């Protein structure tokens, strides 16, 4: 019935208007108008070539991808056993593990980053403990370098990995594992031949979501990184706040959006299979 | 899987306890440190005091930022939940053209790096003199809170039987009436969660506020950010603990509602 259709669109219209007017259009306008400043298509093209040829910017793109990759792998290594335990736990144990993941997940990113600054700082807890036990004579540099960025970002993004993996692991039929065990397979074999293959799409979805969020990350690298850890998001912010170079910021935005949206499309293919798609 | 191998399961359990501890430890550290009595943050604190809380509550600038965040988050959560409820209902019930494309578009603000969203909104706001205008910042926050609302309400609306709506319509209820008298009451637990978590999303949002707040509407995260860039002052530990407490309160409310609802369902059947 046509009346029904119209009311569907009427219901969804406010949300669509909000997202188009305050999200899609501003992004398109910002990119378009900033590039238009350059004048002609040729000028944009040569600016794009010089931006991509610049050491600082190429360096930032490289750094961003390296950090995002290391963070993704770390989150996977820590998240996989955690998620496995969550998917097999019941009752109180399940609630306790879930609390340990959900409380940080919903806590402000600034607060979580600050927590790691308190722990890893020059006068931080780790250094205080190591100094007082006499294991070291002067404070270690655990922050304002890549190590600090990777620790902070892994902590912030870990819940996304665990919750995505959880969806895939919960869907595994435990009778399959019992059958393998009944036929004499050893635990490691069961894991490698049955459990891992069945959760691999979750691994892909979780890794992609963490990587996507990591390449666009701003807060943690800006607070915990050193001068050598400038990531793409930080660079965009600086081009605007410091240099007021809108065309370069627009070109960087295009690059960042291109990577993000391509990987998001890929993520959709894996996440839809696990059914528990929450982004 | 590990039934016959107690050592292996013991190792796994120890690992899980360790990892769970690691997840909570940073948050616990901040809360404990916020009560420290010394002149700077020491862990564990040598003496306990509430001095950093008093310093926070006695500082007009901190309090102003708390108030700004509260006002903005309140507007943003009401607006995004209202708009999101209508959209989530249409998405849950409708098989309309471009449904998947519409959903993907509405969830996009969650995926697109916040720096891009913030810069683009700043570009727009600066031209219309909207920087520092609180209702405008709330509207901007609604864009990133909307996906949170949609995800929560989608799963709630899925549990409501469409036959109840059909029954109401056959009995002569209008579509708007069905929405108000059938769907809205049944979706209430989900609506409360949506309000809570969109409030938190806006209250904790940093990047959009950083660009849009100006001096007039400095929010709490922006104030923390500005102070973190200069030095790690212990007042931030107290502010952070308040934010952590807020998160935990929201989660407890959400858990209580869900518990009440599942009890209701199990007794009514």
Locations of the language-model features?
Chain A
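N-terminal signal-anchor/first transmembrane alpha helix
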Residues: 1-29, 95, 99, 257
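Interhelical loop and adjacent transmembrane-helix boundary motif
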Residues: 2-10, 48-57, 222-269, 273
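C-terminal transmembrane helix and the adjacent membrane-cytosol boundary/short C-terminal tail
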Residues: 9-10, 25, 166-181, 193, ...
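Transmembrane alpha-helices
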Residues: 14-23, 73, 99, 103, ...
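Short membrane-interfacial helix/loop motifs at transmembrane-helix boundaries
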Residues: 17-55, 59, 65, 119, ...
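Non-cytoplasmic
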Residues: 26-30, 113, 161, 202-237
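Membrane-interfacial helix termini and adjacent extracytoplasmic/periplasmic loops
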Residues: 45-46, 113-154, 188, 224-228
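Transmembrane alpha-helix signature in integral membrane proteins
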Residues: 55-88, 154
């Amino acid at each position: 019935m046509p009346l029904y259709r119209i009311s569907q669109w009427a219901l969804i219209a406010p949300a669509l208007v909000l997202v188009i007017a305050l999200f899609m259009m501003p992004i398109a306008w910002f990119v378009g108008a900033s590039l238009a400043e350059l004048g002609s298509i040729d000028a944009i093209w040569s600016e794009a070539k010089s931006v991509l040829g610049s050491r600082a910017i190429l360096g930032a793109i490289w750094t961003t991808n390296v950090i995002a990759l290391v963070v993704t792998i770390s989150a996977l290594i820590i998240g996989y056993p955690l998620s496995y335990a969550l998917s097999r736990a019941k009752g109180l144990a399940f609630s306790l593990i879930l609390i340990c993941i959900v409380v940080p997940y919903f806590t402000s990113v600034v607060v979580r980053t600050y927590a790691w600054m308190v722990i890893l700082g020059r006068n931080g807890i780790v250094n205080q403990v190591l100094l007082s036990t006499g294991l070291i004579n002067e404070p270690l540099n655990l922050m304002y370098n890549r190590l600090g960025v990777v620790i902070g970002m892994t902590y912030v993004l870990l819940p996304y990995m665990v919750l995505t993996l959880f969806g895939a692991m919960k869907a595994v039929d435990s009778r399959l594992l019992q059958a393998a065990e009944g036929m004499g397979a050893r635990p490691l074999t069961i894991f490698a031949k049955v459990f891992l293959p069945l959760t691999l799409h979750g691994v892909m979805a979780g890794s992609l979501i963490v990587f996507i969020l990591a390449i666009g990350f701003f807060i943690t690298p800006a607070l915990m990184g050193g001068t050598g850890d400038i990531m793409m998001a930080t660079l965009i912010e600086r081009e605007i706040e410091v240099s007021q170079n809108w065309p370069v910021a627009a070109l960087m935005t295009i690059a960042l959006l291109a990577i993000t949206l391509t990987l998001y499309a890929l993520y959709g293919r894996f996440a839809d299979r696990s059914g528990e798609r929450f982004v | 899987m590990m039934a016959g191998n107690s050592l292996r399961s013991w190792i796994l359990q120890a690992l899980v306890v360790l990892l769970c501890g690691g997840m909570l430890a940073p948050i616990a550290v901040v809360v404990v440190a916020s009560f420290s009595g010394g002149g700077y943050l020491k862990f564990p604190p040598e003496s306990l005091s509430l001095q950093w809380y008093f310093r926070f509550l006695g500082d007009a600038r901190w309090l102003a930022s708390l108030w700004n965040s509260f006002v903005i988050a309140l507007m943003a959560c009401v607006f995004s939940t209202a708009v999101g409820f209508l959209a989530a209902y249409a998405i849950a019930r409708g098989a309309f053209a471009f449904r998947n494309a519409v959903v993907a578009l509405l969830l996009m603000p969650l995926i697109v790096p916040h720096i891009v969203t913030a810069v683009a909104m700043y570009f727009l706001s600066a031209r219309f003199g909207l920087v520092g205008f609180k209702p405008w910042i709330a509207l901007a926050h609604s864009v990133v809170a909307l996906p949170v609302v949609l995800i929560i309400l989608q799963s709630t609306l899925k549990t409501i039987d469409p036959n109840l709506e059909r029954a109401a319509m056959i009995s002569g209820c209008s579509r708007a009436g069905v929405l108000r008298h059938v769907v809205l009451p049944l979706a209430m637990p989900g609506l409360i969660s949506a309000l809570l978590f969109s409030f938190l999303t806006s209250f904790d949002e940093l990047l959009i506020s950083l660009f849009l707040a100006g001096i007039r509407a400095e929010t709490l995260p922006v104030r923390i950010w500005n102070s973190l860039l200069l030095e790690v002052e212990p007042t931030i530990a107290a502010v952070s603990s308040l934010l952590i407490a807020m998160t935990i309160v929201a989660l407890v409310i959400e858990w209580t509602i869900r518990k009440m609802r599942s009890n209701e369902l199990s007794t009514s059947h």
